[in-house]
Amino acid sequence: MTHYLLAVHGPAEMEEFGNYGSREEMEEAFAATAAFNDKLRAEGYWVFGGGLQSASGATVVDGQGETPVMTDGPYLETKEAIGGFWVIEAPDLEVALRLAAEGSKACRGKVEVRPFDGLA
């Protein structure tokens, strides 16, 4: 089994209801995402998952020099950012892509699928 990152992309800066048009739409997406999370757990794919706060609250840490440098804000200035993610364990890419499509429908966002490069 391989671990995959399913990264949900959305606007870097969130509006009042995230990337949803209304509170109702946001609540529907959250409920659908919770049901999808339950499915991942029940079927044994779930490793970890979560939503992220706005990219403007990020801090970039560069510890390559003698003294770490910490910079407020996202690493890259961009219109989109990762708003949440799942780490799943799946037998192959085909299954990971199928699950990503289900997750995309549930959260109403684009999902990028990337296999992990081995396990640490």
Model-derived regions: residue spans:
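Conserved, structured core segments of small domains
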Residues: 1-120
